[in-house]
């Protein structure tokens, strides 16, 4: 799973937060940039609001953005 996530979300991938199970989570809809994937399969994200909370695979949800995503 980790290798799949590394291929699907390479460093620099832009994402939008859909769901995060954390009381300190950025607001839903916040966008950020993936900086890597850790050994547990969590996406390491620098959120545009300055937060650095990871996205936990299977718990949290992000939308992968591309140039056509609004």
Provide a role label for each language-model segment.
Residues 2-70:
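Basic/aromatic-rich interaction segments and small domains that mediate binding to polyanionic partners
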